[in-house]
Amino acid sequence: MENLIANYPINTCENEFMLPIEYLYNKEELSGDIINDLELLNNNNNKNNKNNNNNNKNNNNKSLYDYVFDSDSIFGDAIKGRWSNYYTTDVGFLKDSQKLYESMYDIEMYSINEEKVNDILMTIEDNTDFEERNHYIKDVYLCDKMNQNESLMTWYSCFLVMSPILSLCLPIFIMIMPLFIIKSQGVNISTKEYFKLLFVLMKKIPIGKLLEIDWTNANSIFYAAISVCAYIFQLYQSFSMCLSFRRNMVSGHDMLYALREYLRNTVYRMEAYIGLSKNYESYANFNKDLSDRMKQINGYVDILEDLPQSKYMIPKKIGKIRCEIYKLYTNNAYKEMIYYANNFNGYLENITAIGKKMGKQMTKANFKTRFSNLIGMYYPAIVGDKKANNVQLNDVKINNNQIITGVNASGKTTLLKTVLFNVILSQQIGCGFYKRGKIAVYDKIHCYLNIPDTNGRDSLFQAEARRCKDIIDSVEEHQDKKHLCVFDELYSGTNPYEASATGYAYIRYMSKHKNVKLLITTHYLDMCESLLKAKQKSITNYHMEAYYDEANKMVYTYKKKKGITKIKGGVEVLKNLSYPKSIVKEATELIMGGNMNNSK
């Protein structure tokens, strides 16, 4: 076991496990902008969150990944964040993943106690004064080797257990021992004569004063009482240490026993997983590492195999238990091994959740296509954990550059997020939230969503311009790569006149690159009209449908239609927020008049 552990470098424990996608050569790092703008992760995606409520009332607290990787365990939550690291253009891997996830029903999920193991890890991570609290040898030469010596630990543990008896018998031992020493020297003295002489000598030392207490003298009585109390206190300390040692031994035994059962069941899970994925070439490197780790874990399980099941049988293996507890606390390789097992179990839980959703909420992607075509797609945060029956589905064919207009709250931004999330998801796990999906895999994915009001010293427009320039630089640098660029409200941080002009120029520039596909939302209708007049064949205008009903109330269909919107709906938002009627009326009159010349 020591050799197996020594073969693995000790890095940060949580980062030792890697998802299969991280072993690929053809992988791309997902930018932090996309992760933040799409809200792929949130504070719920960490290993300490035990309250992952799936109730739809709490959907606002869930990240997008929470709808993909359902998790009721600490380990499943802890590993979610790693999925956001990469996406891939390796179609073979994505197809293998689809088959693997579908077959997860065939794997026998041996039960594991995540919370118990997590508590154990928290205990061994807090190893302050560990040696002192657990009565190990410390601050002496070779103490580390001593604490890992099974025979020495057996004798030392026996001494700790016997300490109360030794303390109780020590005075008697002190009185009798000189008799044997004297007789061994050939001195002829009877036992009676020895104790008579001992009694006389002891009267001459302070402790011997107890033998002739003057019960009429307060000082004599006080001295006797102090001496007796000191002896009793010494006995109390010895008994307390013995009880503490026993509690620690029982706790340590329970810890090792729980770890053994957990790691054994984890090995069974690993064997089952390798059996399912062994024929998938793209998983070969992951499986090789997994197999090596499995041997390491199995070796540790074998070491713990002869642990007594009952705490009453601990004395038989007391030295071994002490050594293994010490190694668990002090050897980082053991912690690394447990973390790897935890992360694997979290990964297994995540992909099992995907398998359960495939064919229901999620559908496998088809990658044999020249352009992406998502049919019946939806945004999972709107639907929640139920099937998409009562939500408007949309189709998006990304065979050209698209500009989408529409009134406020008509669903423009949600449409962009839906496309972006489903494309990313399809290039991570091979499926997405749609009825049918054809994905032309993209080498580079860029987004421009939720630009912050300030970026360091930048104004909003400067932050927007900086993000757009970064995208230009990437397109110029990787002209042989396929790019998908998603922009929400392009250049909205400046006045409408300049925003329309710069947006028009930017879109025309980007649309010249045949390897780039643009999806853009905007409120600047004059920019859309200008692009239409310029007869840019690579650009198509769409809008999110909305209309006024007979009661002059805005109705949102959330359907994507061809053409530029003709509806103005900003004032409708003010109505819905119960603005003063005078504000709504004056704003409406100015809009209907087409200018503000008549305002007072």
What are these regions (language model features)?
Residues 354-600:
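ATPase nucleotide-binding head domains, primarily ABC-like/P-loop NTPase cores
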